[in-house]
Amino acid sequence: MNLEGIEDYGVKNIYSKIAPHFNSSRTYVWQWVKDIMKDIPKGSKICDIGCGNGRNMKFDGVNFYGLDNCEQFVDICKSQGLKVKLGDMCSIPFNSFSFDAVMSIASFHHLSNYPRRMTALYEMKRIIKPNGMIVLSVWSFNQPKKTRRVFSNYGDNIVTWDQYGKIYERYYYIFRITELKDMFNDIGLVIEKHFWDCGNEIFVLRKAEYYEK
């Protein structure tokens, strides 16, 4: 698989074409997201990295800010009154120590190489407060039997999107758990919680120094 430029033509470009269809078909908020949000104090400031159509930014009592690299998604979010910026998760346009929590739900797996993945983790860590947390989810190799998503290998994958009979190919990277754990450790993030839900690997992360007090 030729990965040169794949984040542009296999992620950003594809989502720009399917954004309206995605928006109309992806309105449900996963139960595990709702459960995590119950534990986040009211008044918290949260950044949703790769926020898409903003479906996870509509909880009462918290201040959400979003980031996405797809202009069409940013426009959809703004039309709903959500505070969203256009940008890259490897260069997050927010100040250091700005947020109580960062959420990156089903977006980190679109990064195509190790340096960009580590840079994105560093950026997420940079913008959370010393006692802040990161909630990160990626698609799992282990998918439910009822799903049409079946992965034959870890690493680089193409997953199709059917928009009224027209097929679009999206890039995904399917991680080994050990691979993610090594990256978290190298960047100075501690896993507070890890669980699987509906084909997703979900991690709740804290800065290592949070545990060194």
Kindly give the residue locations of the regions a language model identified.
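A short SAM/SAH-binding and catalytic strip from SAM-dependent methyltransferases
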Residues: A101-P115
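A short glycine-rich, Lys/Arg-flanked "PGG" loop and its adjoining helix->strand segment in the class I
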Residues: M118-P130
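Short alpha-helical functional segments enriched in proximate histidine and acidic residues
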Residues: H110, I127, M183
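A short acidic, Gly/Pro-enriched loop at the edge of an enzyme's catalytic core
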Residues: C90-V102
